[in-house]
From Swiss-Prot:
Entry's Gene Ontology cellular component terms: membrane
Family: Belongs to the IIV-6 203L/325L family.
Taxonomic lineage from the root: Viruses, Varidnaviria, Bamfordvirae, Nucleocytoviricota, Megaviricetes
Keywords: Membrane, Transmembrane, Transmembrane helix
Membrane topology: Single-pass membrane protein
Transmembrane segments: 1-21
Name of the protein described by the UniProt record: Uncharacterized protein 203L
Subcellular location as annotated: Membrane
């Protein structure tokens, strides 16, 4: 065999290996965790301190069985009206809460004027926690598509 043939075979094997080992990136749980880690990393850079452990306390524990596919707030709103049983499962296992927290943190990351640890703490205590613990949110009666604008409004009202 020539060197060129060996190189071509090696490239083909490498491409096949990449194809079969990258399947986990499509797993909804891993997508969520990847998104979470990305947001936490960016917030750590903004506040110039590792606040990941603190941010983890905002999330409810959940596992791979909790979510069968990656969802957006919009798709959850549709699910709430079309398949309330599945929606309640996602609500009860913590996925909806955690998705909201990540969306809220990404709003702070993208739109905060200050990007300080104090600003982050104020935002969490005065914007995220009140919404995520409200009776309507906890019961699944909230219009979830209004949560991002609500969080953004709170961020602007508090001048954070």
């Amino acid at each position: 065999m020539s060197i060129q043939t060996l190189i071509i075979i090696s490239i083909v094997i490498f491409i096949l290996w990449l194809t079969f080992t990258s399947g986990s990136s499509y797993d909804p749980y891993h997508n969520f965790m990847k998104q979470k880690n990305h947001i936490f990393h960016n917030i750590n850079k903004w506040v110039k301190k590792d606040v990941s452990k603190f941010l983890e306390t905002l999330l409810k524990p959940f596992d791979k069985q909790c979510v069968g596919k990656t969802r957006t707030i919009e798709s959850l709103e549709k699910l709430r009206t079309e398949n309330n049983v599945e929606f309640k499962k996602l609500l009860n296992c913590g996925y909806i809460h955690n998705l909201f927290i990540l969306i809220g943190l990404s709003v702070w990351e993208d739109f905060s004027k200050l990007h300080t640890e104090t600003s982050l703490n104020t935002f969490i205590n005065e914007c995220l926690i009140p919404i995520s613990t409200s009776p309507n949110f906890v019961a699944g009666n909230m219009l979830y598509t209004q949560t991002k604008p609500g969080v953004l409004k709170c961020l602007n009202d508090k001048n954070l």
